[in-house]
Each structure stands twice: as structure tokens, then as C-alpha cells.
């Protein structure tokens, strides 16, 4: 039997957010409650027109549909990240539905027919199974018996009838104690349009002009009609006053009940606090008596007095005697430190005198003349170059030798053929006369370019160390100061010191700090920078071809340097140092592991394969991280797993070890396995190095490491098919989400990869690689922008279907990879390709150009051989 009770329509906008208010009407998840009997609405008006209108409205009594607006939907986490004040917009009028629209809207909604006693609501709330109580809108419970719908946590819907407050007062007291009012929500019924009223047959008379109606005198109203009208108005006014009085009495009654309830609760809390206070007083008195008795017993015990005396003696010994000895030792150590600092200052003064060319006799004469002007001393110190000097091992006095060993080419690995260029620079110092005798001009400057961390500074030190010459190193940012003329003065001082200590190497790090193109910066700061650069240009030209001083500079931005600075004659050699390859990375790892306790079975090749794209500084840090982890675990040797784990830390960050549910692990595993399974079917991306679902450095997802051709993917030499393969791989997580969870359960885990696919598809179209040849010319015309998006969408749909086809064909492989990832959290290259061989179903790769050429050549040889055999047979 269906639930029957009349409901008034209420706006659903009170349950919806401002963004969703403009979308009504809409098919929300709903529960229908149908009323099979028409409800007659009777008014007290006696007017015939009012009765006619009332009868017309009664025709609209149709089955009522209740739409439950859930107020407990889970809010997304990103909604709390930023709260902004929303502008108030004018509320749009709600559209009413016709009778046919309302029937279509409520056609397939279920009918609630299951009943429960109203007392079961209290037990369901106590057990935590109650989710919502749906009540008619614009009505207040407790006044009279009202039918309601009960929604449980398992989405079941039941119906019951709640009693009035007078009928069951104890029920409503328990209702308030459990706080069920919070879970009450209003039902919603969309408004219905009234049917059109047919116009009367004499309706054309209404078109008569108004001034003609003035000729007809209105009929005088009778006394009976006037009395009825007055009585009707009095009745309406009395009825309205009674309703207002009833509402006020109800509000006052509710306030009185709440006040009484609060007063009772306040008395209960006061009684509880008083009881606790009295108990605490009794407990305190008892503890006080117990402590007094205990101290009295201890005071009378001689053993306790002896023990306390020993304790106080020990404290006195620790505080007085030992502290005195410690202070005495600290005083002696402080004297030793002061003596060592005095010796160090003396050595530093001697070193400064040596650098400035001041002899000891001159110092003694100057000491007799009196103290120098402190401002003059500060100015002289400020005008020095500030370069760090490292003397050659055969030129420096023994007391000034550095404790560290000079850097050699054996300390620098992963150079390849670049090392030959630098060895020639060393020969310019060691066999310079041989080059001059044959008329070979020795370069005056060498510019080292390359990404950060490839070892440009280390190479410059190795050149100076192999040549055995003095090495001056300075950062280009030290040339520029706020005072006018300081930069140029420091450049002159630097090259003056280098010339006095020739042969030598001047190394300028980060040359782009002072070598930018002139004229870009206006004002005094730009003039000072330009003056410093001009002095550097003159200093570089002054030593050209003499071989006494060679300048080596390093920069990450050779494109912004001044053309006059990098022209031949100043920097004759421009050496680009790229990131190391596979063999170079292996050599760098071996160099940094020379002084570390390495295991005998360490696989440097596996570590080098995992560190594709890393530079020397990152590889050195990997070895250090692995050594620290070894010490932390209490082991004595570094293994391959230590280096591989350190490589992951360097690339992706530290491991995030917070707990996750099994379903979350499985969803992330499906996302990563889909990319790997689809990529293994494409020739440019089939080299899968590593799979993991372990989150690192705050990233909730895992990653798939694919070794790709650097020239193709970094230098922009991708073919059309390679870009389509890339788009297919990026859409694989979305396709897997649809295949494994269905279209209704899609998540946003693949949002980032799908955005990458959209960007790649648009780049493919704008690059002129699509079927419609967009991007060749005038593609920013307004009427073609939509065509570009349509073409990009076609490419995305094609690649998406391709990804679904590959995943459907390899469903067994996907399930196995997902299970392994959920268990082990990571898969190596060998483990992944073992699963591919056992469960994979991939199409054969298309033949390459070389293979096609070989096949054609074999066919041609067979054809020529048959032709020769036929000719020989005919001649015989």
C-alpha cells in the first residue's frame, strides 16, 4: 500500500549549493510516495468564481513525488583549501512542470510501501543505522500525527507515522536526547502548471473599449451581499488572528520547555560538580594524613637518615667537586684554543703579506712608523679581487701547502671525448714552447657550457691540477658591487695577481652574472655592470696568445652572454658538457665509490640504467645517501639495492609510509599498470625500467619509469605515430578505470595524464600532422579554432579506443601485474617482462626500415639467381 499524505511544494534550493541551483529541474536520486486519492481543498469563500478556481485546482491532484535531498554528501577535500566570498546573484524563478512532464519525471521512481513502528526510529538511531528522516515541508512535527519516510544507512527507505506530543510525550523526550532533529530534512515536490482555462464564448465582449463600458451603470449591491462580504472579511481576519495566536502559543510553549530542560540539566551538572568537589576534598584530606604519617615514620627511622646523608653527600660531590674539575679543564682548553687561534692569525698575516708582496723587513719598518689609517686599510681590502688562490704544488712554500690533494683527471669521470679537449689545454702549459715554435696560437679563454651539476667547476680544477699551475677561482657575482668602479678594479686586481703568479688558470664561475649583453639594464647599476664587462673584455684580450694565463669560465646560459665576450680571441674554445650517458654514469659511480665499502657483486650497470638523465652531482649524492642508509642499518657494505633505493630518493623524494586501504592500493596499481601494459606494445616506449605504487615526497600516486630515446623526446624529433602512441599511453589509466570499475564509478586519478593527452593532441593538430593539415598557415582564424578542437577530439577518441582494445586483449596480464604491485608495491624490469612473456598478448612490432631493406635485398638476390638459372638452362 502506498503512503498517502498531502505535501506542499518547497524550493529545493535550500538543500543545494549555489552552483547547482541553476540546474533544476533535474533527475536526482529520489523516492516516490504516491497518493491515490484526490485531496479536496475547501475554502470558506462563498464566491462562485473562487469555487470555480478551487475546482480547477483540485483537478491537479496527481501522484506526489518526493525527492530526497541528501544533506550528508561527502564534501571534496579540495573544497576546504580555499574559501572565497560568493557574489549574491538574483534568484531565478523556479520553472513549473506540466502534467505530462511531472508524470514522466516520476514514472520510474520506486514506491515506498514498507512500514515500521515509529518506536523503531529510536533503536535505529541508537544503533547508528539511521541516516535521514524525511518530513513534509512547511510543517512542524509534534503538533499532530504526521507520516514521514525513514532512510537507513544501507539506502533502504521505510515509512511510519509519528505521534503528536500529547499522544506520546516520552517518545519525544527520547527523540530530543538522541538529537534526531539534526537528521530531519524536508521533502520536495516540483510545482505544477495550472491547465489553461478555456475562454468563454462571449469573450469577444472583453475587447469592447473601456469608455463604452462607462455607459452601463453598475448594479447596486444589495444589503445581503454587502453583509455577506463584511462577514466573510471578519471571518478571514478572525481566522488569521487565531492562527497567529496559535503560532505564538506554540513558540512560547517550545521556549518554556527548552528553558525547563536547560534548568534541569543545569541542576544536574551542579549536583555532579558538587559531588566531585566533596570527593576531591575527602581524597585530599586522606592523602594529607597518609603523607604526614609517612614522614613521621621516616623521621624516626635511623636508616633513612643515613641514606639521605649519603644522597646529599653524592649531590655535593657531583655539584661542587666535579664541576670544579670540569671548569678547570675548560679553562685549560680555552687557553689552548686561544693559542692556536693566535698561531692561525699569524699564519694568515704571513699569507696576506706574501700575496701582497710585502717582505718581513718592510713590515718591521712599517711597525716603527705607526699604525696605518683604518679607513685606508678597509678601502685597500675592499678593492682586492677576492679570488681564492691555490698555489701549484711545486711553487708554494711548505708551510702554506693545502692538506687536500689536487684534483686530477682520474677524479673526473663520464667525460668521453671531452677529456681530449681538456688534455690539449694541459699540453699548452706543459709543452707550450712546442706549440709556439710551430706557430700554433695558444687559446686565451675556454668557455664551459652545460646543465647544472655536470662538473664544470671540477673540470677547471682538474685542468689546473694536471698542469701544475696556480689556480685562481672567483664567482662573477663578486665583481658587481654598489660602489662605482669596484667591479672593474677587482677584474684588474684579479688578472694582475694571475700575471704575477704565471703560469696560472683563472676560473670565473657563473659568467652570466656579469657577462650579460650590454645595454639591457638602464641606470647607474647597468653602467657599473657594463664597465665591469668592458674591463673583463680588455683583460681577456691582453693575455691572448701568450700562454701565461688562461681563463676558464662556466655558465648555464650561453645564449644571454654578450657577443663581444664569446667571440674568438677571448673565448677561443667553447666546450659543451652534456649529461653523462650510460657508460659515463657507471664511471662516475665507480669514482665516487672508490673510498666506500662496496659489495663485490655490486651491479653498477643496473644503477646506471636506473639513473637515466642524472648528472654527476646527483650521482655523487646517490652514493652518499646509500652510505648513510648503510650506517643507519648497521651494515658494513653497500649493495645494489642501497644504490637503487638512493636513486629513487634522489629522483622522487623520501618514501611516504602512511597507511592506505587495500582498495586505494589496488586503484593506484591499476592506474600505473595500465600505462606500463599499453606502453610495452609500442616500439618507442616498450623499455619499461621500473614500476612502483609507493607514494613519495607528498605525491599520492606511483610512477612508471620508461627509458626513451633522448634525441626523439627531448630534441623534438618525434614522428606522427610516436605522438599517437604517447597519447594512447596517457589515456590508458582512464580506459582502465572504465573497464575495471565501469562508467558510473570513474574517479579523477587519471586527470593529470588525460590533460597531458589533450595537450599532445592539440600540438599534433597545430603542428600540421593531422589528417586535415591544420597548422600549416593561418590556423588562428576564428572560424578554424573550433575545427582544430574537433580534430583534436577525434584524435583523442581514436587513441582512447585503441587503449581500450589493448587493455581488453591483455586483461590477464593487467590482473597479474596489479596483484604483484599490491603485494610487493614495486616491480623491476625483469619481473615485469617475465609477466609479459607469461600472460601478455601483444601484436608483432612493424618491421623497421633496415629490416624492410634486408627483405627486399633477399628477394632481389633470389630473383637474380632464378634468372641466371633460367638463362643457363636455355643456353644448354
Curated annotation (Swiss-Prot):
Residues 1-20, 256-276, 350-370 are annotated as: Disordered. GO terms for biological process: protein import into chloroplast stroma; proteolysis. It is found in: Plastid, Chloroplast membrane. ATP binds at residues 450-457. It holds the Pfam family AAA_lid_3. The keyword Cell cycle does not apply. The chain crosses the membrane at residues 59-79, 304-324. InterPro entries: AAA+_ATPase, AAA_lid_3, ATPase_AAA_core, P-loop_NTPase, Peptidase_M41, Peptidase_M41-like. Disruption phenotype: Embryo defective. Keywords: ATP-binding, Chloroplast, Hydrolase, Membrane, Nucleotide-binding, Plastid, Protease, Transit peptide, Transmembrane, Transmembrane helix. Residues 357-368 have a biased composition (Acidic residues). Residues 1-32 form a transit peptide. Gene3D superfamilies: 1.10.8.60, P-loop containing nucleotide triphosphate hydrolases, Peptidase M41. One of its GO terms (molecular function) is ATP-dependent peptidase activity. Residues 8-19 have a biased composition (Polar residues). Residues 258-275 have a biased composition (Basic residues). It is a multi-pass membrane protein. The keyword Protease applies. One of its GO terms (cellular component) is chloroplast. Required for plastid development during embryogenesis. Might be involved in chaperone functions or play a structural role in the thylakoid FtsH complex. In the N-terminal section; belongs to the AAA ATPase family. In the C-terminal section; belongs to the peptidase M41 family. Homooligomer. Interacts with FtsHi4. This is Probable inactive ATP-dependent zinc metalloprotease FTSHI 2, chloroplastic. It comes from Arabidopsis thaliana (Mouse-ear cress). The gene is FTSHI2.
